[in-house]
Structure formats: structure tokens, C-alpha cells
């Protein structure tokens, strides 16, 4: 994050750490790119190659679109403070949410077996669960979920505004701590194995 102080007002303003002009290549090995978004309504589409892990912290409701990314294996949204942000074009990546108390949106998941990791998400309060939308525009193509949860209070949904998601028929959950995972109504109707 870039922190700038306005000389006229003395106000601090943070700016996004990535934009659509960025071209990054991680090369060999396992690489992690950490992104902070600060401007609401921003849609950044960076070109990423050989970067396996993408971590995003939303300070405002914006979109990081990975349509020009290759080799991404895990997308993690963590420690966000602003309105629900969206990570689009996640393809076959594992989707992870950590230390999060605001909603998260993903889009464009093509994984048939979707790995979901939730660590210290939401709270036990009556309205403490956060919503994780697995397909804001294009529904998730997962036919099964593999969920790892630790102290997670999550409501899963798929808005699927343009393209319907696949029919999910099974889910596995490995849980530690206290958890509450609520599936989307459409998934509850079709999951046969839990």
C-alpha cells in the first residue's frame, strides 16, 4: 500500500498496490503476491505469470481480476476492512479466507473439486457469519467441496448472475475449533454425501 499525506489537508490516503498495467513474473519456485486495494470501484487486471499464491486485503469494495494470470494455485482474501471485494477469474485455484469479518466474493471458479480454507472467519454472534459468494457472475463449476475450517462462521452462496454453477453433490469438511458452515440452498438440495 502506498501512503500519501495530502500537504494541504494533512490527510492520509492509501492507494492500491497493483493495477492493470502491472506485469509480474515469479519465475521458478513458489511465489506469493500480496495485494492491498484501497480505492472503491477499482477493477485491476494485472498480468501475472508463475505466481502461485495471491493474497488480497480489501480496504474498499473493488475487484482484482485474474483473467490475465497463469499458474495461480491459491487465492486468499484476509484481514479486509472495507466493503466486500471480489477476486474474479480464479480458475482452478484453492480459495482461502482468513482473519476476516466482512463478506468475500469470488468469481470464475472452474475447479470441479473446489478446495476451500476458512481460518478465523466471522464470529459466533447471531449475525456474525460472513457470506462467501463462490460465483458472483459465473457460478462455481464445483461438483464437490473440500473444506478445511478453523473457527469459521461462514454462509456459502452463489449469486451466479450470468452463468449458473454446476450441481454440487458432495462435500468433505475437516474442522477444528468451533465452526458453522451454512451451504447455499441450491447446494443443500443436491449434496448427497457429506
Which stretches of residues belong to each language-model region?
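Solvent-exposed, low-complexity segments and loops of surface/extracellular structural proteins
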Residues: 1-194
